[in-house]
From Swiss-Prot:
Protein name in UniProt: Kynureninase
Tagged with keyword Transcription regulation: no
Example of a GO biological process term: 'de novo' NAD biosynthetic process from L-tryptophan
InterPro entries attached to this UniProt entry: Aminotrans_V_dom, Kynureninase, PyrdxlP-dep_Trfase, PyrdxlP-dep_Trfase_major, PyrdxlP-dep_Trfase_small
Gene behind the chain: BNA5
Pathway as given in its UniProt record: Amino-acid degradation; L-kynurenine degradation; L-alanine and anthranilate from L-kynurenine: step 1/1; Cofactor biosynthesis; NAD(+) biosynthesis; quinolinate from L-kynurenine: step 2/3
Length: 453
């Protein structure tokens, strides 16, 4: 190990000195054995990029809502002993979410799920013409985004010819031998297709590689060529600084069960830039009607101004209210403080991993047991590091992942060969980072020994 690397004592000291160390006590840390470990005790949970942990106050809030349902039933929509009437359950969330994504409150809605929200907004804002109909998306995008984007040109077969539908998608791919997209290559694709692009759809943070896209550089080019910019912020919100207004993003969607800890398959949300016109193309529902007249049951749809006018159904209480606890905690801590700690936490993980004898440099011979990191260096990432387990062609990742689980480290596997590790500032520690690296090494050492037999 290099002398510049932290020792175990250093990591313990950093945790003790950490001004945010108290937030870990706000969460319920999973049991290692329940997660597949061989021993009892708390797991090292580095999987908040997939599903965040349960906030203790979220448990309390859920129990309170169950009590209201039990004692008040339907009247809980209007009279609520905890001042959270179900009729307005989204209202206390909106200011927090707007601040977190860098938007105005009227530009944010809290509803449905990510892919459904994506379809909702594409229905309104993908308006292809004979000359401008293409959608730019990265080829390695999350499958649900890929499926959703491909489905929309087919809905416009009265406007688009079959050959246009077949060629409606421009797929961004990294350069040969590289794992992530270069900003200059994205800009070149936009320039080369400037007259035919209708929408550019990107993630803020790429789910597989952990790459944070340079939206501030991409957005001006998108608008210069006359296209709209949409973002999938599933891995961005609560993880990295989001500045939707400053970046001039047109629309965006997100989920809340990762870094916002709202629970499995919890509610989603979306953003629509003020002034963005839908040309009368809107999927309407009663919860998008003006709240002042919503319960008049009028046959005439009067949309709420802004993003909330694109809502359809009433807000699900039990997948929304757990979100409040983490949003209030973020407000108390200060998101900029979280980002600063995240840089240190993930930076420490990166440094220790790169010091490992199992870290494989590009110049190392092929066939070596180990890992490479495909996530870009700071600042072009969030908390996640994506490790490709080598050799890729031998598909050793599942075995290594299973060994890690048995030793108490909960990461996230993504086929064919990636293990994602994401230390989350609200409940992970520097000491856990050190132990996580040891477990990765132990798992690879066992694989190495098995190959020698």
């Amino acid at each position: 190990m290099s002398n510049d690397l932290p020792t175990k004592k250093d990591l313990v000291k950093w945790d003790q000195e950490d001004a945010l160390n108290w937030t870990r006590g706000e969460y319920e840390i999973p049991n290692s054995k329940a997660c597949g470990g061989e021993a009892d005790g708390k797991a090292i949970y580095f999987c908040g990029n997939s599903l965040g942990l349960l906030n203790k106050k979220a448990r309390q809030h859920i129990m309170e809502e169950l009590d209201v349902w039990s004692t008040s039933s339907v009247t809980g929509h209007f009279n609520h002993p905890y001042q959270r009437p179900w009729k307005h359950v989204d209202e206390p969330l909106t200011p927090h979410l707007a601040k977190l994504v860098g938007a105005r409150e009227e530009e944010v809605a809290h509803t449905s799920t990510l892919t459904s929200n994506m379809h909702n907004l594409f229905t309104s804002f993908y308006q292809p013409t004979e000359k401008r109909w293409k959608i730019v998306i990265e080829k390695g995008s999350f499958p649900s985004d890929w499926y959703a984007v491909h489905s929309h040109p087919r809905l416009h077969d009265k406007v688009l010819r079959p050959e246009q539908i077949d060629n409606a998608i421009i797929a961004l791919v990294p350069r040969e031998g590289e794992d992530t997209l270069r900003t200059e290559d994205i800009l070149k694709v936009l320039d080369d297709n400037k007259d035919s692009i209708a929408i550019v759809w990107l993630p803020l943070v790429q789910y597989y590689t952990g790459q944070l896209f340079d939206i501030s550089s991409i957005s001006p080019k998108v608008h210069e060529i006359g296209a709209l910019l949409g973002l999938d912020m599933a891995h961005g919100i609560g993880n990295v600084e989001c500045k939707l207004n400053e970046w001039n993003v047109d629309f965006a969607v997100w989920c809340t069960y990762k870094y916002l800890n709202a629970g499995p398959a919890a509610i989603g949300g979306f953003y629509i830039r003020s002034g963005l016109e839908d040309g009368g193309r809107r999927l309407a529902g009663w919860w998008g009607n003006d709240a002042r007249t919503r319960f008049h049951m009028s046959p005439n749809f009067q949309p709420t101004p802004g993003a909330k006018g694109y809502q359809h159904s009433c807000t699900p209480v039990f997948s929304s209210i757990p979100l409040l606890a983490t949003l209030q905690l973020i407000e108390a801590v200060g998101f900029s403080n979280m980002v600063e700690k995240a840089r240190r936490l993930t930076g420490t993980l990166e440094a220790l991993l790169k010091a490992s004898r199992y870290y494989v440099h590009p110049a190392d011979p092929k066939g070596k047991i180990g890992f490479k990191i495909i996530t870009p260096a700071a600042p072009y990432r969030g908390t996640q590091l994506s490790l490709v387990i080598l050799p890729e062609e031998e598909h050793v990742m599942p075995k290594v992942f299973d060994r890690m689980l048995r030793k108490g480290l909960v990461g996230d596997e993504r086929k064919p060969s990636v293990i994602r590790l994401s230390p989350v500032v609200l409940y992970n520690t520097f000491e856990e980072v050190g132990r996580a690296v040891e477990i990765v090494e132990e798992a690879l050492e066992e694989e190495e020994e098995e190959r020698k037999r």
